[in-house]
From Swiss-Prot:
Keywords: ATP-binding, Cell cycle, Cytoplasm, Kinase, Magnesium, Metal-binding, Mitochondrion, Nucleotide-binding, Nucleus, Phosphoprotein, Serine/threonine-protein kinase, Stress response, Transcription, Transcription regulation, Transferase, Ubl conjugation. The TXY motif contains the threonine and tyrosine residues whose phosphorylation activates the MAP kinases. It comes from Homo sapiens. Highly expressed in skeletal muscle and heart. This is Mitogen-activated protein kinase 12. The gene is MAPK12.
Length: 367
């Protein structure tokens, strides 16, 4: 059997958990960190700056048109994002020297250390930290929403946190209906807005605000707020707290099935949030009552939530970068596998790193 060709000049090869990695020589000390449905992540040290980075290798991104489309969208979304509370790209590279050879690419991002899910398992968070973490979630969401993107699947596991309690949102805009079919991974519904769970109607960016409310409540109480065993049970758990919606809301549902289901439910009164959220400050309770509203049209936006008195000590209007709308008209085009490869290769080669590569950037990098 012939041995594989030598590594590309300026690259080196290493086996990581039975997978061959070929990365740029500036990234040293590859250590496996974790793996998910679509790829594996290693930490590394950037030899130019000494900064720790996370490198993600997608599993066979061009195994099918569906996977190729997802890989292309992930790359374009990450390239678009330049905000301190949203994960962005420090670098992207391929060891493949031509389009014909192109099979893999690697995404380099800031290394964060942990995620909110792990953090909550290990310690009870105090009010100040909860306030700071929720503030950062909302700032990141305001930016993502201004770009015209809906996260759709915000949960503690995709909120990365470092040792300074700085937070970055991961995996935004990637949750599509096809995911479970592609990977067999079961999607957790506990943080999903009712209109997403039941496909009630065209949903808006406030689906993400519902998720923030669920996460904030969990940080306060140490327990998952709505822990349904399936989607109908999830809805029942939600309504035990929010109460059943008025008839006028039910009429607005686009699905007849959902309308009939809702009409058949016993009437439930809205609970007093303060009784569920023991130990929460009155301002925290008030903010949660504005986020966990069954009717999406009545839910606060990220910008409105940030202006809430709960964040008075943190609010800083100077801090907000402008964002261009993300053009997703390229993402849903039907292309052959070779066309997906070609457009992805072009995106990899056209990447320009943020100006302060790997350095700690206190203000957002302008687009």
């Amino acid at each position: 059997m012939s041995s594989p060709p030598p590594a590309r000049s300026g690259f080196y090869r290493q086996e990581v958990t039975k997978t061959a990695w070929e990365v740029r020589a500036v990234y040293r000390d590859l250590q496996p960190v974790g793996s998910g449905a679509y790829g594996a992540v290693c930490s590394a040290v950037d030899g130019r700056t000494g900064a720790k980075v996370a490198i993600k290798k997608l599993y066979r991104p061009f195994q099918s048109e569906l996977f190729a489309k997802r890989a292309y969208r992930e790359l374009r979304l990450l390239k678009h994002m330049r905000h301190e509370n949203v994960i962005g790209l420090l670098d992207v590279f391929t060891p493949d020297e031509t389009l014909d050879d192109f099979t893999d690419f690697y995404l380099v991002m800031p290394f964060m250390g942990t995620d909110l899910g792990k953090l909550m398992k290990h310690e009870k968070l105090g009010e100040d930290r909860i306030q700071f973490l929720v503030y950062q979630m909302l700032k990141g969401l305001r930016y993502i929403h201004a770009a015209g993107i809906i996260h759709r699947d915000l949960k503690p596991g995709n909120l990365a946190v470092n040792e300074d309690c700085e937070l970055k949102i991961l995996d935004f805009g990637l949750a599509r209906q096809a995911d479970s079919e592609m990977t067999g991974y079961v999607v957790t519904r506990w943080y999903r807005a009712p209109e997403v769970i039941l496909n009630w109607m065209r949903y808006t960016q406030t689906v993400d605000i519902w998720s923030v409310g669920c996460i904030m409540a969990e940080m306060i109480t140490g327990k998952t707020l709505f822990k349904g065993s399936d989607h109908l049970d999830q809805l029942k758990e939600i309504m035990k707290v929010t109460g059943t919606p008025p008839a006028e809301f039910v009429q607005r549902l686009q699905s007849d099935e959902a309308k009939n289901y809702m009409k058949g439910l016993p009437e439930l009164e809205k609970k007093d949030f303060a009784s569920i959220l023991t130990n929460a400050s009155p301002l925290a309770v008030n903010l949660l009552e504005k986020m966990l509203v069954l009717d999406a049209e009545q839910r606060v936006t990220a910008g409105e939530a940030l202006a809430h008195p709960y964040f008075e000590s943190l609010h800083d209007t100077e801090d907000e970068p402008q964002v261009q709308k993300y053009d997703d008209s390229f993402d849903d085009v039907d292309r052959t596998l070779d066309e997906w490869k070609r457009v992805t290769y072009k995106e990899v080669l056209s990447f320009k790193p943020p100006r302060q590569l790997g350095a700690r950037v206190s203000k957002e990098t302008p687009l």
